[in-house]
C-alpha cells in the first residue's frame, strides 16, 4: 500500500527490519522481502511484544543522537503511546499495558480499557477518539500542560539517550513494571469470580 520510495526510506525500512528480525529470527535486506504474514514459531506473550515495541536501531546510538532524535528504531521520538493488549472472551477483562511516551524510556502501565478507561489518561471520549483516528483536529497536536500525556512526553524528551544514566533509568522502569504487574493475575482471578455472581 506504500510506494517503493517510502517502503525503502531508512526511517520505515529500519523499524520493519528490526521487528521482522525479532519475530522470525531472519534479517531481511530489502523492503520487498518483508513477509505479509508469518506463522510464528512460538507464542508471543506481553513481554515479547513489549520487547519488540521497545526496540532501538543501532543507528540511533550514533554519536550526536543524544536525545533519540534520529528515530530509526521502533521506539522513536514520534512514539507518544504504545499499547499491548491481552484479549479475553469477556471484553471487560481485556487487559492493556500502555506507555504514555516512548516505550524504551517509560513503563507499560496495566489497565482494563473496556471496564472503564482511567479518567487521567482519557482526554477523548470513545466516539471522539474513533472519529479523530484518521481525521484528527489540529488542537489535538498542540501542547497542553493539563493533559497528563505531556508530562510523560516532557520527561521522554529530556532523557539523554547517550548518557550512562539511560540504562539505570531503564532498570528503574523495569522495576516499576514488575511492581505494577505483581497483583494482576490475582486481581483478574477475583474479578472473574465476582463476575459469575453479579
What is the predicted role of each segment?
Residues 1-198:
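C-terminus-biased signal that marks the final domain/tail of proteins
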Amino acid at each position: 500500500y506504500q510506494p517503493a520510495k517510502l517502503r525503502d526510506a531508512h526511517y520505515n525500512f529500519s523499524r520493519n527490519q528490526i521487528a521482522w528480525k525479532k519475530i522470525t529470527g531472519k534479517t531481511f535486506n530489502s523492503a520487498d522481502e518483508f513477509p505479509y504474514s508469518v506463522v510464528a514459531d512460538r507464542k508471543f506473550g506481553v513481554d515479547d511484544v513489549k520487547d519488540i515495541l521497545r526496540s532501538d536501531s543501532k543507528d540511533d546510538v550514533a554519536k550526536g543522537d543524544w536525545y533519540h532524535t534520529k528515530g530509526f528504531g521502533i521506539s522513536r521520538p514520534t512514539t507518544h503511546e504504545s499499547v499491548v493488549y491481552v484479549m479475553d472472551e469477556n471484553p471487560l477483562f481485556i487487559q492493556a499495558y500502555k506507555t504514555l511516551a516512548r516505550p524504551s524510556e517509560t513503563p507499560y502501565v496495566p489497565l482494563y480499557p473496556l471496564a472503564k478507561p482511567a479518567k487521567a489518561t482519557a482526554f477523548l471520549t470513545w466516539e471522539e477518539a474513533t472519529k479523530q483516528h484518521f481525521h484528527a483536529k489540529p488542537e489535538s497536536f498542540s501542547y497542553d500542560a493539563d493533559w497528563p500525556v505531556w508530562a510523560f512526553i516532557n520527561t521522554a524528551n529530556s532523557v539523554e539517550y547517550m548518557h550512562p544514566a539511560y540504562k539505570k533509568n531503564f532498570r528503574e522502569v523495569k522495576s516499576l513494571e514488575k511492581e505494577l504487574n505483581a497483583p494482576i493475575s490475582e486481581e483478574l482471578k477475583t474479578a472473574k469470580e465476582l463476575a459469575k455472581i453479579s
